[in-house]
């Protein structure tokens, strides 16, 4: 069964001035179980709106999106979200953040503690369970956010620019971690990013979205995510295929931005 299906998805907003904004128009796609999709595009192309509809935070104006045959009409435990900022409870310890969802469901404490230890090992935070979250760096906090999401075993992981606030070196390490988690869990993942390089490195599939109205402009099927699981991300970025695809997409988005600026003048 296909994991996620979007059919004729439309989202229309009204501005305070009464103007109509077509944030998404007739968005159609099918994402199969276990695929990693990255979504890229200029500001205003609707990529975050698409993610919020998939998360159940927004209801579309028309059309529908369904996970495993069930139409999404609100948040659900089968979907996990990782935000640009960790959205952690900074007054709690690392372990208390990670097991928060399981504690709310009143799961067995012994089994929960074991799961916490397993996920902290996977995300590279072994030994940090009792550390107050506010003492962690930005990169470490995002590792906590990943563990907190994954410990609940969602079918679909939604990531809204999760690495955007990190420095270059930490971001590279986290990109490798995302690929490692994808390989080890087989989870379906949608990751929103503003970085062309990141979209190419992490996306088994990549959608470039265009604005006004927000829509899928072009789809790419890419080899780089599979290469990056066991390979060197820096070396992958030097390959002719990566370089040429990056330049093609950069030019595409540049032209979109120029068109938007022209309309706004």
Swiss-Prot record:
Pfam families: ABC_tran. Residues 7-236 form the ABC transporter domain. GO terms for molecular function: ABC-type taurine transporter transporter activity; ATP binding; ATP hydrolysis activity. It is an enzyme of class 7 (translocase). GO terms for cellular component: plasma membrane. It is found in: Cell inner membrane. PROSITE patterns: ABC_TRANSPORTER_1, ABC_TRANSPORTER_2, TAUB. PANTHER family: TAURINE IMPORT ATP-BINDING PROTEIN TAUB, TAURINE IMPORT ATP-BINDING PROTEIN-RELATED. Belongs to the ABC transporter superfamily. Taurine importer (TC 3.A.1.17.1) family. This is Taurine import ATP-binding protein TauB. It comes from Pelagibacter ubique (strain HTCC1062). The gene is tauB.
């Amino acid at each position: 069964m296909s994991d996620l299906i979007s059919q004729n998805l439309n989202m229309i907003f009204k501005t305070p001035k009464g103007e109509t904004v077509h944030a998404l128009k007739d968005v159609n796609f099918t994402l199969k179980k276990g695929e990693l999709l990255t979504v890229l595009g200029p500001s205003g192309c609707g990529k975050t709106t698409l993610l919020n509809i998939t998360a159940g935070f927004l209801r579309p104006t028309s059309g529908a999106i369904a996970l495993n045959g069930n139409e999404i009409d609100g948040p659900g435990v089968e979907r996990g979200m990782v935000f640009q900022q960790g959205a952690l409870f900074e007054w709690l310890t690392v372990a208390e953040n990670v097991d928060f969802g399981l504690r709310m469901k009143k799961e067995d404490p012994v089994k929960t503690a074991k799961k916490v230890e397993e996920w902290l090992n996977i995300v590279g935070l072994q030994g940090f369970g009792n550390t107050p979250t506010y003492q962690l760096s930005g990169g470490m906090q995002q590792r906590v956010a990943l563990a907190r999401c994954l410990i609940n075993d969602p079918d679909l992981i939604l990531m809204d620019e999760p690495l955007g606030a990190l420095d270059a070196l930490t971001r590279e390490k986290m990109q490798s971690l995302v690929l490692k988690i994808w390989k080890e869990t087989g989870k379906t993942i949608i990751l929103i990013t503003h970085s062309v390089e990141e979209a190419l490195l992490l996306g088994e599939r990549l959608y470039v979205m265009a604005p006004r109205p927000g829509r899928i402009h072009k789809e790419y099927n890419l080899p780089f995510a599979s290469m990056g699981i066991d390979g060197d991300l820096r070396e992958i970025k030097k390959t002719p295929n990566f370089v040429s695809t990056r330049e093609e997409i950069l030019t595409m988005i540049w032209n979109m931005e120029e068109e938007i600026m022209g309309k706004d003048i």
